Regions:
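Eukaryotic N-terminal, low-complexity and coiled-coil-prone scaffolding/targeting segments
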Residues: 1-97
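Extended helix-rich, non-globular scaffold segments
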Residues: 58-143
Length: 143
């Protein structure tokens, strides 16, 4: 049963990320959808922080949705700013996840940063969400 659930989850994720890729590569991409996925990253990180208001405030400051929107909707790709945003996001994941996953998270970061510019946003969204899924799985095992 566990194997079937895993296969269903993998198929769902593949279809979902294929839709993201198709959307981003379309003539008129739905940027609101991508922005919502970025906001979801922020919300998921905040959900892991229950009481520490200082950390919650730092996450809120680091995840500037308007800045992200500007980055992805601008016709001129700002690789330096995007790199900072990607690194900041993965730094938060590394702070909040179990240390056993640090190597795989850093590999995901490298994958994103080494992506070609036209694919970097979709790969970033996918890889961060996969890291957050791992944190969720770890937390479920603890309860």
């Amino acid at each position: 049963m566990e194997q079937i659930e895993k296969q269903i989850r993998e198929n769902y994720h593949k279809a979902f990320y294929d839709l993201i890729e198709e959307n981003i590569n379309s003539e008129k991409p739905d940027l609101d959808w991508i922005i919502r996925l970025y906001e979801e990253i922020k919300e998921r990180l905040l959900s892991f922080i229950k009481k520490n208001q200082k950390v919650r405030q730092q996450i809120n400051e680091d995840f500037d949705v308007d800045f992200f929107k500007h980055l992805i909707s601008n016709d001129v790709f700002d690789f330096e700013s995007m790199t900072k945003l990607i690194n900041s996001t993965f730094d938060w994941v590394l702070k909040l996840q179990a240390p056993i996953h640090d190597a795989s998270t850093n590999e995901r970061r490298k994958l994103v940063l080494n992506s070609e510019p036209k694919k970097i946003v979709q790969i970033f969204i996918k890889e961060v969400h996969l890291c957050l899924d791992q944190i969720d799985e770890d937390l479920q095992k603890l309860t």
